[in-house]
UniProtKB/Swiss-Prot annotation:
Coiled coil: none
Name of the protein described by the UniProt record: Alpha-conotoxin PIA
Source organism per UniProt: Conus purpurascens (Purple cone)
Organismal lineage: Eukaryota, Metazoa, Spiralia, Lophotrochozoa, Mollusca
Domain remark text: The cysteine framework is I (CC-C-C). Alpha4/7 pattern.
SS bond list: C25-C31, C26-C39
Length: 40
């Protein structure tokens, strides 16, 4: 990813943290690995 994506991800971190436990991605190990910012 580039710097612009990182900045956007930083701004979204709080919202992601609130929704992570309900995100269906987080019950999929492959998705979790590719989206650590969502599922941590």
């Amino acid at each position: 990813s580039d710097g612009r994506d990182a900045a956007a991800n930083d701004k979204a971190t709080d919202l992601i943290a609130l929704t992570a436990r309900r995100d269906p991605c987080c019950s999929n190990p492959v998705c979790t690995v590719h989206n650590p910012q969502i599922c941590g």
